[in-house]
UniProtKB/Swiss-Prot annotation:
It comes from Streptococcus pyogenes serotype M4 (strain MGAS10750). Pfam families: PrmA. This is Ribosomal protein L11 methyltransferase. It is found in: Cytoplasm. Keywords: Cytoplasm, Methyltransferase, S-adenosyl-L-methionine, Transferase. InterPro entries: Ribosomal_L11_MeTrfase_PrmA (IPR050078), Ribosomal_PrmA_MeTrfase (IPR004498), SAM-dependent_MTases_sf (IPR029063). Methylates ribosomal protein L11. The gene is prmA.
Amino acid sequence: METWQEVTVHVHRDAQEAVSHVLIETGSQGVAIADSADYIGQKDRFGELYPDVEQSDMIAITAYYPSSTNLADVTVTINEQLAELASFGLQVGQVTVDSQELAEEDWADNWKKYYEPARITHDLTIVPSWTDYDASAGEKVIKLDPGMAFGTGTHPTTKMSLFAVEQILRGGETVIDVGTGSGVLSIASSLLGAKTIYAYDLDDVAVRVAQENIDLNQGTDNIHVAAGDLLKGVSQEADVIVANILADILVLLTDDAYRLVKDQGYLILSGIISEKLDMVLEAAFSAGFFLETHMIQGEWNALVFKKTDDISGVIGG
């Protein structure tokens, strides 16, 4: 029977998705995230018992590695990557190593216990893939396998992206999802009525994970996933382009986004920490976009831009 080793990273909540990705890149086969915020306002809808958890901005991300992994080497690499993330302005922390060995079935039980269905927007609820869930009238359920490290859709940047997509889509649109990760924004776009969605990610792992999550959701055959470096080489025009990635990367795609967004179309940018906000705004304005909506949650910002000649309905118009 295969056994597993644990590596736990204690970081600020804002770094959740970036650090989870680092752990997968170093060979982790899955992660579990313990976040006190997950228990805020939880209700025992079906008789669940939720623990009394002290609230903190810090979270614990536990990664699981095969027993053959050299954890000393992995820890060095993780610390180097955390230092790089810190240079981007993300709040990170120190690595603690727990070399406890777990049987494979124990590992599965360990990480699954952290996840519950979560209502993200008015219409969208994210549900772990193994959970039976009875949706209410009008509720759109996104099935995700959060054990694949790209987040559960509950991070502030993802929440704001989902809210923006929900507000914009009316049905029949073409959507491009840049840096798709788990595929959650593409799945949401499909459920909200988009006609065709193109999902791109530079990471082959993300491409695979996104496709696996898409396959969990019925009626999402209109999502096309492919490896891609932002919008380079893309010629397909879109009504909406959405990107939830680091600000330093967002500024590299605004010109291509303007080229591809149809007139009266939208560009949704999220993943922007406050200190990088002006940089992203400048890049989008320089490309020709007008700002329509600015959302803020904690230190995170999401921006909705419009490609239009009629600026009466946009900020500053």
